[in-house]
């Protein structure tokens, strides 16, 4: 386990990750978030902002659309990984980040990862 913690710490320092702020408000905010693996596989990775506000106990649906190979799957997994890393206690690949303590975007983290080869993730 110590080797995993050390690997996260070294990666955080080398890749300019930031300490996420865990909050009790139902808002997820990520400024200039990056996918930790995808950014290593391309010459230029465009960071993405994310804002999901679940206030007032209302159901929220966000629809993510775009052409094939435009990065939709990478974006969804990026947000899921940032939330997951924050809950692990790790720093995250972003400029700044606020993560609610109880949040899950429903993305399956166990899906295969052909995105690093420029392919979309097939539906499960």
Region spans (language model):
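Flexible beta-alpha connector loops of hexameric P-loop NTPases
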Residues: 37-40, 65, 106-123
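Alpha-helical coupling/stalk and coiled-coil linker elements that connect catalytic or binding modules
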Residues: 1-70, 74-76, 80-104
């Amino acid at each position: 386990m110590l080797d995993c913690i050390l690997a996260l710490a070294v990666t955080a320092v080398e890749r300019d990750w930031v300490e996420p702020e865990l909050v009790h408000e139902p808002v997820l905010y990520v400024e200039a978030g990056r996918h930790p693996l995808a950014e290593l596989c391309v010459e230029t990775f465009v960071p993405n902002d994310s804002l999901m506000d679940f206030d007032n106990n209302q159901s929220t649906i966000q629809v993510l659309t775009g052409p094939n190979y435009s990065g939709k799957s990478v974006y969804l997994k990026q947000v899921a990984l940032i939330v997951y890393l924050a809950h692990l206690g790790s720093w995250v690949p972003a400029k700044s980040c606020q993560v609610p303590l109880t949040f899950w975007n429903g993305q399956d983290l166990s899906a295969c990862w052909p995105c690093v080869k420029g392919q979309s993730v097939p539906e499960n």
